[in-house]
Regions:
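Conserved ATP-binding subdomain of kinase catalytic cores across diverse folds
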Residues: 18-122, 151, 155
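Short glycine/proline- and charge-enriched loop/turn segments
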Residues: 59-64, 128-133, 187, 200-206
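C-lobe/activation-segment region of protein kinase-like
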Residues: 177-238
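Soluble, non-transmembrane catalytic domains of enzymes that act on hydrophobic metabolites at membranes
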Residues: 1-12, 19, 26-27, 99, ...
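Alpha-helix N-cap and loop-to-helix initiation/capping positions
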Residues: 69-72, 138, 200
Length: 238
C-alpha cells in the first residue's frame, strides 16, 4: 500500500519515495524510538541547492477512530500543513510526503519540507538581542503577528497539539516602520481538527502559556492581538 503527495518529482521516471528516502544528510533530530517505531529528521538539499528537511519514519504510527489499525504520523502532519497553508498560517512548504506499507504491514514514511529561510525560534530571537535591536514598536508587531497567526489556525478549528515556544518561529526583515514580520509554526505531528474553535484555542493557548517565557504583560498583549482576529475571549488563560 502506498500513499503519496508530490509537489516536485525528481524526474518523470524516478520513484519519488525511493529518491528522497535514499538522500542522506546531517541529522537534525537523531532517530528515536516512540509510538512503536522510529522517527528522525535530516537536512538534505535538492538539485537546485535548496535546503530541505526530511522526516523519516519506520513503524511510527498513531491510532484513531478513523484509523484503528494505525496510520503513519507524517500523513497527519501533511494534512495539517496543507490545511494551515490554506488558512494563511505560516508553515513549511511541503515538497513530498509518502508512506509505503510492506507485506509484513510495517510502514516506511517520509515527509520533506523546504527549510524556513531567515526564521528563528522566538526564544532564540530574544536571546540574540533582536528585541533590543529592533525596538519596542517592532516587538509589538512580533506579538501581533504571533497572535494573528494562532487565531487564524484556531478559527479553522485546527489545534497544534504541541504548541511550545520552540515551535513558534519568527522572521523580521527591515527596520523601524518598514519592518516586516512573518511567523511560522513547526512540528505539526500532533495537529488535528477539533469540534469547535474554542476547544482548539483553549488547549493550545494554555499549553503555550505554560511553555513560554513571556511576562504577564507581554502575554496579555499577545492575547489582545489574538482576540482582534479570533473575536472572543478564551477562559482560563491567566
Amino acid at each position: 500500500m502506498t500513499v503519496d503527495f508530490v509537489q516536485q518529482s525528481p524526474s518523470a521516471t524516478e520513484d519519488p519515495f525511493e529518491f528522497y528516502w535514499n538522500q542522506q544528510g546531517e541529522w537534525v533530530e537523531e532517530p528515536n524510538q516512540r509510538r512503536g517505531g522510529e522517527s528522525g529528521v535530516q537536512r538534505i538539499h535538492d538539485g537546485e541547492g535548496r535546503l530541505l528537511y526530511a522526516k523519516r519514519q519506520v513503524g511510527h504510527t498513531y491510532r484513531s477512530w478513523r484509523y484503528p489499525l494505525g496510520r503513519p504520523t507524517v500523513l497527519r502532519e501533511q494534512d495539517a500543513l496543507l490545511a494551515l497553508s490554506a488558512l494563511s498560517v505560516g508553515v513549511p512548504e511541503l515538497v513530498y510526503c509518502g508512506a509505503q506499507q510492506a507485506t509484513d504491514k510495517q510502514w516506511r514514511a517520509l515527509l520533506v519540507t523546504v527549510g524556513l529561510e531567515g526564521f528563528v525560534e522566538i526564544d532564540n530571537w530574544y536571546a540574540a538581542g533582536e528585541r533590543e535591536r529592533c525596538g519596542e514598536a517592532v516587538h509589538d508587531r512580533v506579538l501581533e503577528a504571533i497572535g494573528h497567526t494562532l487565531a487564524r489556525m484556531h478559527l479553522g478549528r485546527w489545534q497544534h497539539g504541541c504548541l511550545y515556544a520552540k515551535h513558534v518561529f519568527v522572521r523580521v526583515t527591515g527596520q523601524g516602520e518598514g519592518a516586516e514580520v512573518d511567523v511560522a509554526l513547526l512540528d505539526l505531528e500532533k495537529s488535528r481538527q477539533r469540534l469547535t474553535a474554542q476547544k482548539a484555542a483553549s488547549h493550545d493557548l494554555k499549553q503555550l502559556r505554560r511553555h513560554s517565557s513571556w511576562s504577564a504583560t507581554e502575554w496579555d498583549r499577545l492575547i489582545y492581538f489574538y482576540k482582534t482576529v479570533f473575536g472572543s475571549a478564551i477562559k482560563g488563560l491567566r
